[in-house]
From Swiss-Prot:
Keyword Cell division: no
Gene Ontology biological process: translation
Protein name: Large ribosomal subunit protein bL35
Domain of life: Bacteria
Pfam families assigned: Ribosomal_L35p (PF01632)
Keywords for this protein: Ribonucleoprotein, Ribosomal protein
Organism: Shewanella putrefaciens (strain CN-32 / ATCC BAA-453)
Length: 64
């Protein structure tokens, strides 16, 4: 059986940790002037992928 391929886009966006998959939060690319400093600061923090999405991410990262 051939090797499974890693989805490179997913590999760049998610990192496997002991607690699940770490990801960056959205809404911090543009139109930042109307967002408060507190909101932007909190959006810089990494968060975990939700439980429902973990199987899909794991399938695309077979060697993670």
């Amino acid at each position: 059986m051939p090797k499974m391929k890693t989805d490179r886009g997913v590999a760049k966006r998610f990192k496997k940790t002991a607690n699940g998959f770490k990801r960056k939060q959205a809404h911090l690319r543009h139109i930042l002037t109307k967002k408060s400093t507190k909101r932007k600061r909190h959006l810089r923090a990494k968060c975990l992928v939700s439980k429902a999405d973990v199987p899909a991410i794991a399938r695309q990262l077979p060697y993670a």
